[in-house]
């Protein structure tokens, strides 16, 4: 136990010390991408290139994200007509604007007419002979999923300085619009070389095969452990704490206040997500940070979740004992809701809207309370919560578990108070029966079974991380499908944030039925919808096909089938989905997270009598980009190793004989490797932030 404690303590301390050390090694003076300058201001409007730090030379097109802010209203300018033209300065001759503020009327038809605002000195904007700005070569910039953000298609073929010329067309006094002109400089950089990282990743992937084989060899040659792992509940302070009636309320109260604050700020504060604490707390800090708890402590977040607490409190007050119909006691409702919300974020930009964020959170509270009034215990958490199924799957990776010490003692106990409850405590709120529990999927360490078990037959102990993936006896199609589909969903979430994404969607749209739509933004959204739902179905079908191939390679045994193999081997993809979520959220947490500090200052200054300093909206990141790229690569390679190992262990359990077990898993091993390499390539591409 002492050695084990030292290992865990050393790993934790090393992780805490290594992160700032790596950050300092790479320098801690650069700033969060997208916040380096104030752009250009013309009249009451501010213009900024949101993703100017992620523009690199590439073969395909990408989109410049132009943000337009109405300074009088302090909010993004939505629904405007914007024309833009990326230029290379050396290719244009500076022409001065004509004298006078009001040009003469003309029938010049190469551009919109109306009045204009002169661009700043040194402009490369051209002027027509009639004294109006020449807008030939300008393209319409459709509004993206976030209000006030306009997409300018651009082919970055040359490295060096560029200009983005912008024309904002506003309603004029007559029939012709008023034209506001400006230009924004930006640099096209050389792409960060993929060769070194790609070769490193390929080498590490091959090494993962070797390590997985070695781990299997050691696993089957070593003698079994003669002593049980140390029970953490033998620590008096931990045992008292988890058995205390205050164990859950003390953890839930701060998050209940925090979620209430998020709802309130989302409704009353600024609609700009990068200046509203609600979206930063919810999507940048909470959602990105809570995923790390799944790896370390399984479903521990659920014991703190105020939404689950609201459902359970309501159920107790109402005395509801009803259960969902048996056909609905699956993960399918939760899976459908999670996919629907993920798609809606890509379609409407939920995470970039404080108002929508507030209403979604309020809707979750309302749904949890309604289900608590109608159904027993935490029915909402077990079967309906959109992230409940995802948390359950990822919790299988956690290196801790709560299990019975002895199944014989459980079988000899006729009362089963751990499930039914008694005077000392309530039955399991997640409808788990500890005697049959063989995974972390639905246990969130609420401590109720510790209070009700008179024989003290429960142990909280460390175990091999990911052990549930290959040891649990009960496997279900809904869990296996979610495990595989999450690989596709996580990849889509990451792909939606990389710089070439809009270029890919534009190229794909040209092949789809809605290619002729004049509304470019709508066409882009329809393409995203098609790609999202197709990938959520296609990836599971590919895994099913791998199972069909494995079934044929092993001689088509009668006792199994491609369907049964899908249900068994689908769990091997859990580490890949988790790793992609972690890798995708690392930049959000460590690059966008620092913005929460000045926004918190702004919020306190605005809504309280206290002044805690002027906010600096240009904070330094918590970790530098090179460090994050290294961490992303390591996370994916670790997941590759775990998935390979899990697939091999499942293969040994499925076929037993070495001849068959070495033949059967190869389709899965090859697919796991291909998915990992695709994700590594995706994360090597420039990625933009959600909040600017």
Show which residues each predicted segment covers.
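Membrane-interface module
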Residues: 418-421
